[in-house]
From Swiss-Prot:
A GO molecular function held by the record: metal ion binding
Pfam families: Arg_decarb_HB, Arg_decarbox_C, Orn_Arg_deC_N
Organism whose genome encodes this protein: Pseudomonas syringae pv. tomato (strain ATCC BAA-871 / DC3000)
Protein name: Biosynthetic arginine decarboxylase
Enzyme class: lyase
UniProt keywords, alphabetically: Decarboxylase, Lyase, Magnesium, Metal-binding, Polyamine biosynthesis, Pyridoxal phosphate, Spermidine biosynthesis
E.C. number: 4.1.1.19
Parts forming coiled coils: none
Disulphide-bonded residues: none
Reactions performed catalytically: L-arginine + H(+) = agmatine + CO2
N6-(pyridoxal phosphate)lysine PTM positions: 110
Length: 637
């Protein structure tokens, strides 16, 4: 283990408490993740009062058992704890406000359809939990996995077969709601209900005018892909009334968007939504359920703010708004209190999964002070940079930086114009980065005049840590929508991270890197890291990847699924592993794009046979090619 380093600002010894602050784990960890006194990340799957699990130790054991990196690690116990927290928040507010109905949490399986995820959520004891499906494949899964009598809500665009399957689910004993998203679905429901001789339970999705501020705001508001306008709503009601099925309209549904950061935005939209409830009741419809959709967010960056990757509220605040506003409206209008559904899939699943990656290589600027024998022989601009390598008064730190940057710009121009040589340009660059490194060590984050330069140098001096994973396969939201995910080393957190780095993946794509990082209470373009120790793997954990990432991942450069494992905790604190799945092989990935490994081997044999190589080489080449098809698409770890 490396020698502990001292903090640059005040000279005191670095402690684990400093790492907790720098990586913000207390803020985004939600009581599940922490740093122990040994400087390692630990997880408490059943909440902050449960027994800790040393993540670095677990990953080491899993690697020794044959699993390889990158590794997706799931903690199904966290799923059940999240369900208990969410239902507990609603139940406590229902009791506190004397609300005269109940709450059921709906899990929309589009968030993560993995069997272990769905089964662990619905297996949570002593809670009311249902499932939501938005496509025929999802509905087929839900019909099998939902407990008998369980609630199933059917959203999304529907054809005749979708509606028939939903009605079959109702006849099989499930509490099924078919939510009308567009007018053309009405006749299909009427016809299929008559064919199956079942009275359908119908929900109506309204398209709100209100729009929340979030990365997914387009899923709500007037431009939403789904939902009925006011005129369409009245038309749908009338068509069901003419068919004699209007008394089956029992649910009102709306959706304002995912990851709503500001609770005030939600309150504004909810005020509009509950007006629809009142109007539908006035039309004589027996609406007694309201599905408030998604929106309950996750504090990814730990700032507890209205940033796009944060939220300025918690589960209890959210439940209090929903229950409180509904009760106030219903009491004022003398209306019954409806049963509440919410589709809080992101909040239920985000925390339960993390990705472990290994740093395989480092690229850094040469910021060592060069040895210069004859300064006078150098171009004038390079000489000026050499002069800046000497001591600088603290008052002149920022001015020295701006001068050095100006000189470096001149050097780049002179090289392009053919006025200086490649060697002279390289020396100028080394001098420039040596000046920047020296100035960086003199800057004080607490001094306002230093902050702009400090931010620029954090970018310029950041190393490139090449990591054994694919952003596109494992963290698609980080490149697609700029999602921020917390990242930190799993070990060495009792040492100061003296470098900064940008994490880059293995793909041949300029977007194959992580561009934003949680750094204390802010978002930065690089992250604090440790220098690598020779002979020791440096492992990073990327957290809160349990929602959407696994299912949205793609195969860019033919990087496939990673190894994965579910870690469970026994009541005595011990752990066991289940659901182990190994990585996609190169052969698997080639088959995905309809390249036959058998045909490829035939081509290999033909080329080896016609090549001017020795018999021994032929055997070696064919064995290597055959073995290569069975290997992981990632680098060997």
């Amino acid at each position: 283990m490396s020698v502990r380093r001292t903090r640059k600002d005040d000279g005191s010894q670095w402690t684990v408490a400093d790492s907790r602050s720098v990586y913000g784990i207390r803020h985004w960890g939600a009581g599940y993740f922490a740093i122990n006194e040994a400087g390692r990340v630990e997880v408490r799957p059943n909440g902050p009062d449960s027994s800790p699990i040393d993540l670095y130790e677990q990953v080491d054991n899993l690697r020794k058992s044959g699993l390889s990196l990158p590794l997706l690690v799931r903690f199904p116990d966290i799923l059940q704890d999240r369900v208990r927290q969410l239902t507990g928040a609603f139940d406590s507010n229902i009791a506190r406000l004397e609300y005269q109905s109940q709450y059921t949490a709906l899990y929309p399986i589009k968030v993560n359809q993995q069997e272990a995820v769905v089964e662990n959520i619905i297996a949570t004891q002593n809670v009311s939990i249902g499932l939501e499906a938005g496509s025929k494949p999802e509905l087929m899964a839900v019909l099998a996995l939902a407990p008998k009598g369980g609630t199933i809500v059917c959203n999304g665009y529907k054809d005749r077969e979708f509606i028939r399957l939903a009605l079959m689910g109702q006849k099989l004993g499930h509490n099924v709601f078919i939510v009308i998203e567009k007018e053309s679905e009405v006749e299909l429901v009427i016809e299929e209900a008559a064919e199956l001789k079942v009275a359908p339970q119908v929900g109506l999705r309204v398209r709100l005018s209100s729009l929340a501020s979030s990365k997914w705001a387009d899923t709500g508001g007037e431009k939403s892909k789904f939902g009925l306008s006011a005129a369409q709503l009245l038309s749908v009601v009338e068509r069901f009334r003419k068919a004699g099925l209007d008394q089956g309209i029992r649910l009102l549904h709306f959706h304002m968007g995912s990851q709503i950061a500001n609770l005030a935005d939600y309150q504004h939209g909810f005020k509009e939504a509950i007006r629809y409830y009142g109007e539908l009741r006035k039309l004589g419809l027996p609406v007694d359920y309201i599905d408030v959709g998604g929106g309950l967010g996750v504090d990814y960056d730990g700032t507890h703010s209205r940033n796009a990757s944060s939220i300025n509220y918690d589960m209890d605040d959210y439940a209090g708004v929903v229950v409180g506003m509904l009760k106030e409206f219903c009491d004022a209008q003398s209306l019954p209190h409806p049963h509440i559904f919410s589709e809080s899939g992101r909040s239920l699943t985000a925390h339960h999964a993390m990705l472990v990656v290994q740093v395989t290589d480092v690229e850094k600027h040469n910021d060592e002070v060069p040895k210069i024998a004859d300064k006078e022989s150098l171009p004038e601009t390079v000489q000026w940079l050499v002069d800046l390598l000497g001591p600088t008064d603290i008052e002149m730190v920022t001015e020295t930086y701006w001068r050095a940057t100006h000189y470096m710009s001149d050097i780049a121009t002179q090289y392009a114009d053919g006025k200086i040589s490649l060697a002279e340009k390289a020396l100028g660059e080394q001098c420039y980065f040596a000046v920047c490194r020296r100035l960086y060590n003199s800057l004080k984050a607490r001094q306002r005049s230093h902050r702009q330069v400090l931010d620029e140098l954090n970018d310029k001096l950041a190393d490139k840590y090449i990591c054994n994973f694919s952003v596109f396969q494992s963290l698609p939201d980080t490149w697609a929508i700029g999602q921020v995910l917390p990242i930190l080393p799993l070990h060495r957190l009792d040492e100061e991270p003296v470098r900064r780095a940008v994490l880059q993946d293995l793909t041949c794509d300029s977007d194959g890197k992580i561009k934003q990082y949680v750094d204390e209470q802010s978002i930065e373009t690089s992250m604090p890291v440790h220098s690598l120790n020779e002979g020791e793997d440096y492992l990073l954990g990327i957290f809160l990847v349990g929602a959407y990432q696994e299912i949205l991942g793609d195969m860019h450069n033919l990087f496939g699924d990673t190894d994965s494992v579910n870690i469970y905790q026994n009541p005595d604190g011990s752990v066991y592993h289940a659901g182990i799945e190994t990585h996609d092989t190169i052969e698997d990935m080639l088959r995905y794009v309809h390249l036959s490994p058998e045909e490829l081997m035939t081509h290999y044999r033909d080329k080896v046979a016609s090549a001017k190589i020795t018999p021994r080489e032929r055997t070696y080449f064919l064995d290597a090619l055959r073995l290569g098809l069975t290997r992981s698409s990632y680098l060997s770890s």
